[in-house]
């Protein structure tokens, strides 16, 4: 039997320090970073997407950053294809792929083998998945019986995946993820995360977020990229509807809500091992745990 090669995945809500940790891990284990963020794919949108700085990108190779023009759409289907290609390339050069990001749908779609067909609207899949996850175990079993779906080993996650496959058919190709992965999450008390978010928004505004958002507003106000948090909150300010202070507060509030949704996703839908970032030694703990993971015998395919 062939052995599965290993990769590292770092997730968590916005503003917890995923980028910095990813660089530390890349430097410690001869790795390269694959961005798992739906907004960082866009050229010219650097501040509002919290993209790794030029200096940070020089300290560790980054993939899937600046690969789309702001006029182009990007989906979970695109990410899965691009990420698999990047992983294969990185491993072929004897390095460790490190996926770093907070877009739960993208990460889950990759790791759980959801290869979305081109005809499938990912919002339809997401809505159906949320509907299924609201059901009790008994209701899921009833639905499986109704659809004549059977599983050798029943878990909620496998049941939901099987029902989705039944619903969407060929547009949701179910393929096992071909690599063994360690899934690391960064988190802490909500108040601590929210404080970091507020500080980050202030820093972004000081770094030139207003000018970046104004460029997007003036040139491409209707594109997918303009709907991202960090930009849409400033559009009413440009239109004279609210003050800059109000826009700033809206941005902080929306970012906090987004972080809460991110955490809910990772906690409820993925098997993440979380590390509290308020502990000064957390990067050392993570690096030690990664070392153990990488040194263990690779899993049989």
Swiss-Prot record:
UniProt cofactor(s): Mg(2+)
Enzyme class, UniProt record, top EC level: transferase
Superkingdom as given in the UniProt entry: Bacteria
Stated role: Catalyzes the transfer of a dimethylallyl group onto the adenine at position 37 in tRNAs that read codons beginning with uridine, leading to the formation of N6-(dimethylallyl)adenosine (i(6)A).
Swiss-Prot/TrEMBL site (Interaction with substrate tRNA) positions: 103, 129
Region (Interaction with substrate tRNA) residue spans: 37-40
Subunit details: Monomer.
Protein name, UniProt field: tRNA dimethylallyltransferase
Annotated gene: miaA
Residues binding substrate: 14-19
InterPro entries: Dimethylallyltransferase, IPT, P-loop_NTPase
Species of origin: Streptococcus uberis (strain ATCC BAA-854 / 0140J)
